[in-house]
Amino acid sequence: MIELKKYQRSAADNLRELVERALRSSENEVVVFQAPTGSGKTLMVSEALKGLVKQRPTGVGLSFVWVSVRMLHEQSKEKLERYYEDDRLLQCSYFEDLEDRKIAENEILFINWHSINKKDINIYVRENEQDNNLNSIIQNTKDEGRQIILIIDESHHTAGSDKSKELIDVIS
C-alpha cells in the first residue's frame, strides 16, 4: 500500500474539496491543480479521486476522462491501477476496454491528446457505423445520470486546441 506524505495528503484533500464545490455549482467549473515536478501529482490526484468516490451521495455517480500528452496516459493508467489495486474503488480503462459504449460509474477512461487532435486518425470523435466514438460514449454516460469529470494532464500543452475545446464542451 502506498502511503502519502503529509503535504500530499493535504493537497489531495484540498483538491477533493475544490472539486466537490465545483460539482455542486450550477456553472461549469474548472479546477486547476499544480505542483512541482516530482512532488507526486498523479498520486495526489489519485487520492483525491478516491475521496470523491468514497464520499459521493448515494445515486450520484461519477465517471472520469483522463487525457494526457504523448504516452503519459499509459504511464498514468499504470500508476493509478497500482494505487487502486488494494481497494478497487476505481477502474482504469482505455477506449477499447469500455463495455456498453459508456464509461461506468467510478471508471477512468484514459486517452492520449494525440488521438483527439491529430487529423485523420481521430478515432475517438469520428462517427462510424457502430456509433462507437467518444462523443457517443460521453452522451451515453451522461444518459446514465453520471457526472463526468475531465482531467487534463499537462494541460498547458494542449488544452487550448480547437479539438480540446470541443471535448471540454461535449463533457460539460
Language-model segments: which ranges?
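RecA-like P-loop NTPase motor core of helicase/translocase proteins
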Residues: 1-172
